Regions:
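Non-catalytic, well-ordered alpha-helical scaffold segments
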Residues: 52, 83-87, 122
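A metal-dependent hydrolase metal-coordination microenvironment
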Residues: 1-80, 160, 165-172
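Alpha-helix N-cap and loop-to-helix initiation/capping positions
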Residues: 42, 46, 116-119, 145
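Residue-level signal for well-ordered alpha-helical scaffold segments within enzymatic catalytic domains
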Residues: 57-60, 88, 127-130
Length: 172
């Protein structure tokens, strides 16, 4: 057994003048491909910018968070989650009312997962293919779309060149 390169991109596709967020998986690609490396770097920079926006929003608008709380979050990490922000609140002994408010806020608004860093799906497909990778639509039934919308998206993605579709997601 051996490992292969893998990545999940946050991307979007237009469907009936509506921007639909999708996750695209790339497998078995050349990890040294320049086009792929550039797209990964762009996604990282967009994610970091979105996370800074989240922290500034929370710091200025919602709570008087001390700088040392925010400094515990590693903004350069490639993958950063809302739970790290909530962990800072817990470490600073904020009440459960405040912590639960933020859990609900992030869950309902997805502030840190907004369109600030979604990439156009064709760019993602092209980058993975240019690196000799395999392109897969992740969890198609998890997008809270109608069956017809999912069918239309799969058809459109097929025309754009995806290679496969994830068929099982444990929480769907």
């Amino acid at each position: 057994m051996h490992g292969i390169a893998g990545v999940e991109f946050s991307s979007y596709i237009m469907l009936n003048n509506k921007k639909i967020k999708l996750h695209i998986l790339g497998y078995g690609f050349d990890e040294n491909n320049i086009k792929m490396l550039n797209l990964l770097q762009e996604m990282k920079e967009k994610r970091v910018a979105a996370h800074i926006k989240l922290l500034n929003f929370a710091k200025m608008k919602l709570l008087n968070l001390p700088e040392e709380s925010l400094s515990r979050i590693n903004m350069e990490r490639y993958c950063w989650f809302d739970r790290e922000f909530i962990k800072c609140l817990e470490q600073d002994n904020y009440s459960m009312d405040v912590i639960n408010y933020y859990r609900d806020y992030f869950k309902n608004n997805r502030f840190s997962y907004g369109p600030d860093y979604d990439l156009e799906v064709q760019r993602v497909i092209d980058a993975i293919h240019s690196a000799d990778g395999f392109v897969v639509l992740a969890h198609p039934m998890a997008y809270k779309l109608t069956r017809d919308e999912v069918t239309n998206i799969i058809s459109k993605l097929s025309d754009l060149g995806i290679d496969g579709i994830e068929v099982y997601q444990s929480d769907c």
